[in-house]
Amino acid sequence: MSAFFELRIYQVLPGKMEEWLTFMEDTIIPYQVKKGMVIHGSFVMDSSDEFSVQNGERTMNSETKGNTYVWIRRFENKDHKEKLYKAVYESTDWMNEIGPRVAQLIDRNSIVVHNLTSTQLSIMK
């Protein structure tokens, strides 16, 4: 497997988005970058649009998503991902300080991670 991305989607607990963003930007992202992670982007999902065709007519339904946080990380290959996961998530700092705080801000049972490979024309490689 060659280079790929993780698209990570979290549900932030109600009323915790500002606190989560501060924690991500001041603590988690710098910590993970220091450990070797490559972060391509960090986003708040404002809304989702779903499209369908009904009776030959295209329709769009929009849903507000103010508690959804999305970020993208890049890995060289599966071994690189496993090495960085171990360096981050098995570290004393993560287990004793960062991880417990994460559990106070997001619903860890709702985390979704999509592994993506860029297509030939993608600018993200």
Locate the predicted segments by residue.
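Short, structured motif recognition centered on aromatic/hydrophobic residues
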Residues: 4-9, 20, 32, 67-73
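Glycine-rich beta-strand-turn "strand-cap" elements at beta-sheet edges
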Residues: 37-64, 93-125
